[in-house]
Amino acid sequence: KMDQIIAGTIINILATGLTSFFYSQGYVLPAITPKLRIPILADIPLIGPVFFDNGLFTYAALFTALLLWVLLFKTIWGLRTRSVGEKPGSADTSGINVQRTRFINVTLAGALAGLAGAYLSIEAASTFERGLTAGRGFTALAIMIFGAWNPIGAMAAAFFFGLANGVASQLQADEVIAIPQPFIHMLPYILTILLLAIVSGRIDPPASLGNPYPFDFAS
């Protein structure tokens, strides 16, 4: 029944502490995942290396975004999921268990967030250290908003953020522009602030987002 933003912040801090603890105990030994290059398609200029020359996690992320769009907007499960976020009272009246539906979906979302962290340590960086995510999870919240709570929109927004960060890093590596390293780390968050300022008030979130629904012991 507590405020969901506060609960999420507590869980986030707990997760940070747990990863630091297990890392200090020597329990973490990430393995490098091999790249899966798709012949012919990977040779397409510009888009080939982006979409067809990646590791398993990248392909899984692209597939998951498409799958979630189908599930959310083309299935009964998706209709129920959206209803408990928009009008939980009406969903409850129609016989949908609001608490259970929300719990299952939040659990699935947490699992996907965990896979995103695994991508950073296993596929992208091939190592693990404290603070590896550098707050990228909060950028993901901005991506979700910028994508209008739509998996395809969020994927497009993620491409935009990744492209901007990648271009800045490449310019620095090639010494085309003398960009201080701290600014490179700041860039995703500067973009987040700018984009949120632009889209704020133009994109409507789910009506009951973050609002706990009264628990019914009879359910």
Tell where the protein language model's regions lie, with residue ranges.
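Transmembrane alpha-helical segments in multi-pass inner-membrane proteins
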Residues: 124-189
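Hydrophobic core segments of alpha-helical transmembrane domains in multi-pass membrane transport
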Residues: 16-20, 58-71, 109-117, 140-143, ...
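Helix-loop-helix "hairpin" substructures at the membrane interface of multi-pass membrane proteins
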Residues: 50-128, 151-152, 156
